[in-house]
């Protein structure tokens, strides 16, 4: 993905003969040293991708190194990125991924300078380089590694200067957070107001339209948080039951962690409702009216209520962060793990175990939602991480519209962006201790579903990769802020004095010089039409009916239970509750009896032939038609090679995603193999060389 925009240059002394884009550059360097780029080469190469506001801070000739790689070129530092331009390289316009030679400053996770065999300095923002480096290693947060070696001689000062430029650029980037919704150059070509490709859920109309799409007739849009005075981490609007007044919503939300009370996440067509909320604020002292309002919101008009303890059997944030760090270290090109021990090391990261846990938990919740008409409430203390992950996975398993390209983007916007997932904190851009790649974990889970059910998803692996890469690309505020309130405040949409919120895509007043702030869904401003076309999965079958996977035919699976049946789902167990709220009588919160919810012994496909051990009054409960139940045992969980091994192109062969262009590439590769093997055919078989069967028999 290509990006750029406006920014500010840094207070770094310019190099002599510093090349400007399209202007004069350094002269060629005579002698045996590596030739320096000419002004035309450097200027034209950068001008093809640079946008107004990007400035070259420093550059140095070098060689990109790696397994079987020794590529001469130029290392360039700008106020937005670090890029390596190979000699004679031209930017390809049809690549669906970001250039392997470009690293956004915000994407650099680790910077190391090397001199000799043992002298290594870890360079943090603001560090002082203690020696002239012979090599520079940039470790990307997206599993890439840029290793550049510098030649000795007159180039040593340039190597020092480009390294210091990177250090200072990263420092100023982290201090002032210069990425303030960079305005892309193509925006200037758009006249008038620009309609967002995906509803950003910043207006009352957006929420009302989405509510109608889901058919949630018993729900309405609450405006109680329109000024962000109930919960700053929530959006200004959300769905609550029709019969609950906004005054009751305000009082009820005060008894939940960070004011994140129960609200609708998704309405199942069969009648069930999936809710999410934060943990109960035990220290509060609600009155009877407040407790009644909380219970009414949790029940959502249903007689059956199931509280799901989201974090049970799920990894902690620290576990996810540690697993991701181990995975990134394992997948780097310079990993020291022997090839015969690589799979064991991969298992030791536990990343795939955590993917498995998420899919298993989402499958359990999906059965709870579809088996009977009820209210299923996802409860997590902060309500900003795993509630969004599990809610999104449940909708992917149950809602065909969520598996479309438009639907998936809307799902992420609603359950992650508008719901206040702390992207900036979790993705490690603030240096906080709460770093954890929860959203990349969700993308891995979505990729697993795409591999297991390729005909069910309209989007392709290339789209998931583009979204994965967009996490740390500083052209929008979508993933660079923690809450909708922060995005609105930073972009000038929210007036802290008048408490007036202006939607991001509203038409500015006449004479206003405010820039148009983009969302991550404005793909056409960063990608060509050819690239966007690869976001679609050619194997998607919108008419595909998954009912054939289930042998049982059910006329009506969604039936009500007895009045006031309350349950807690934790660790695969349904436990009856005497009450929903913990403030009345905490000693009688849990009853002693419980019913086990069995898991499949060998494969999740066997769940279609099992009866789930739900409470007896619910009767026999076979799986409903249309429910996608992913496999999560053993080799059913696969390794996302195209994402995590992108820094090792030698292992990417044969891992093409399912796109038309990928099939063409595979065909070209097979034709090349045939051409290589054709000379090996014996002379007496030359007359038969046009027969494909003869050629294939020679190959085998």
From Swiss-Prot:
Source organism, top-level taxon: Eukaryota
Domain Myotubularin phosphatase: 201-644
InterPro entries (UniProt xref): MTMR12-like_C (IPR022587), Myotubularin (IPR030564), Myotubularin-like_Pase_dom (IPR010569), Prot-tyrosine_phosphatase-like (IPR029021)
Region (Disordered): 1-39
Pfam families assigned to the protein according to its UniProt record, in alphabetical order: 3-PAP (PF12578), Myotub-related (PF06602)
GO CC aspect terms: cytoplasm
Family note: Belongs to the protein-tyrosine phosphatase family. Non-receptor class myotubularin subfamily.
Protein name: Myotubularin-related protein 11
